[in-house]
Amino acid sequence: MFSQTVSVAVTGGTGQIAYCFLFALAHGDIFGPDTGIDLRIYDIPGTERSLSGVRMELDDGAFPLLQRVQVTTSLHDAFDDIDAAFLIGSVPRGPGMERRDLLKKNGEIFATQGKVLNTAAKREAKIFVVGNPVNTNCWIAMNHAPRLLRKNFHAMLRLDQNRMHSMLAHRAEVPLSAVSQVVVWGNHSAKQVPDFTQALIHGRPIVETIADRDWLENIMVPSVQSRGSAVIEARGKSSAASAARALAEAARSIYQPKEGEWFSSGVCSDNNPYGLPEDIIFGFPCRMLGTGEYEIVPGLPWDAFIRGKMQISLDEILQEKASVSL
């Protein structure tokens, strides 16, 4: 019935992002309509009852692709021989919490998860990290899982890309399908770099349609950078459904790529074509090669505005890295 079966782990299984994401996963949005799924849903001890409710809903959804659904509070059981992991669970930033405090708390979580991945997951497993601060959490997990391939760790910048994509399409009054090569560099934070200089509308440079450089630099860029905070202020909660959709799209770009598609992802900077420091997780434009492997899109020019923003984002990533210990 199935062309293959993949074993998939999802952490933070009782949270809102996972709740939205799991149904897209079960529907086949990521691995396709012919791939069976052996699903393991993890959350911390004390969440057993909520986990059982999530499993009930997946059972009630009668998803043909779900060959097995296991809920667990054991990381080893969740990660055992998996092909892919979606690391969603993390400690949210609370009132009065400094970023360094958040880095410390989540650093411990992702160090533990990295160690278990290292012993339990398949060497070729792809790891998608969502929990914030996502670049540094991804870097911590990667460095605690040296048996796994470093190139297969991804920090999610797709939500930032989607936000930028939507804003550009609305401003240009064109369908989303008309906008391509939407690129977000750097850190998933308020210092990310939404790079409009690479974007195309109907295959032409964006400035031919949106000539207002002031809007691009001083309205669009900061709006994308601060969109997460704006959602929290308006909704009272952080992004969930849009984050889940972005995660599904990020993974689908790898498992079911469209020819020529660019996608933004936080990946290991080792041997990157832009001369950035190695051993960090940095947002780059990527594309699939048709072999199941991706490459960082090389040779893109940076004007003075983008170059300045890039340095700010790089400095933040390096500061975060220096503030945590492995």
From Swiss-Prot:
In Pfam terms, one family for this protein is Ldh_1_N
Q: What does it catalyze?
A: (S)-malate + NAD(+) = oxaloacetate + NADH + H(+)
Cite the entry's keywords alphabetically.
Answer: NAD, Oxidoreductase, Tricarboxylic acid cycle
Q: Kindly give the Gene3D superfamilies that the UniProt entry links to this protein.
A: Lactate dehydrogenase/glycoside hydrolase, family 4, C-terminal, NAD(P)-binding Rossmann-like Domain
Q: Which EC class does it fall in?
A: oxidoreductase
Q: Name one GO molecular function term.
A: L-malate dehydrogenase (NAD+) activity
Which residues bind NAD(+) per the record?
A: 12-18, 106, 113, 130-132
Write out the similarity annotation: Belongs to the LDH/MDH superfamily. MDH type 2 family.
* Protein name (record): Malate dehydrogenase
The record's gene field reads: mdh
